[in-house]
A protein has these predicted regions:
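Bacterial signal peptide processing site
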Residues: 30-32
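Heptad-repeat alpha-helical coiled-coil/4-helix-bundle sensor or tether segments in soluble regions
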Residues: 115-128
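Hydrophobic helical h-region of N-terminal Sec-dependent signal peptides
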Residues: 18-23
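Short, solvent-exposed, charged loop/turn and helix-capping segments
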Residues: 90-118, 133-137, 164-172
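C-terminal motif of bacterial Sec signal peptides marking the signal peptidase cleavage site
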Residues: 26-28
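C-terminal amphipathic alpha-helix
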Residues: 37-89, 126-193
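Bacterial N-terminal signal peptides that target proteins for export
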Residues: 3-17
Length: 193
């Protein structure tokens, strides 16, 4: 009888210990999943902290192109003056293109999203450079048409970023959903031609 009592006593602590170990393992798995989401959230927040000031500054800067083009179309400024003003805008934009290319996202997923997004700045800079030359020559019929490629890349960036942010419960700027939906390149004439 003594041996039987001893066996029962030994089994209970072992069973209890095994149960506790299983609970600890399950809690650990849950905290790892939470930890991964938290890490991804922090990565997204860091990335947006770098990208958002550039994106907003570019939006504001490009808003300055329309008054230049309107004045050119209405012949309130000469072609050379329009080219000079647009050239100043293009040089400021080129600095932002360098800034966005210098962003180093902390995760592979964000790097994969950022590379094509940064390429849209290259397209825009090339367009602005061609626009400057076209304004100087008073000839705007041969500008590169990169809007569709830019729009698609920006839309893929926005959607990919939204998917990652939802999975990590990370906040995104409220106006981000408009990215890629408006006018991409300043139109040299009111009808876009």
């Amino acid at each position: 009888m003594r041996g039987a009592a001893r066996v029962g006593v030994t089994r209970r602590p072992r069973a209890l210990a095994a149960g506790c170990m299983c609970m600890v393992a399950l809690i650990g798995c849950g905290s790892q999943a939470g930890s991964a989401a938290s890490t991804q959230r922090q990565a997204i927040e860091r990335y947006m902290g770098e990208v958002e000031p550039i994106r907003l500054a570019v939006n504001k800067l490009l808003g300055g192109a329309d008054p230049i083009l309107e004045a050119f179309r209405d012949r309130r400024i000469a072609p050379r003056e329009a080219a000079r003003r647009m050239g100043q805008l293009e040089r400021r934009f080129a600095a932002y293109a360098v800034d966005i290319a210098a962003v180093n996202p902390p995760t592979a997923q964000l790097r994969a999203l950022n590379a094509p997004y940064a390429d849209t700045y290259v397209f825009e800079d090339a367009y602005l450079s061609a626009l400057v030359a076209g304004l100087a020559d008073d000839e705007l019929t041969h500008l590169p048409n990169t809007q569709a490629a830019q729009r698609a890349a920006i839309t893929r960036w926005r959607i990919g970023l939204t998917v990652l942010a939802r999975a990590a419960d990370a906040p995104l700027p409220a106006d981000l959903q408009r990215a890629g939906r408006g006018e991409i390149a300043p139109a040299p004439s009111p009808n876009g031609s």
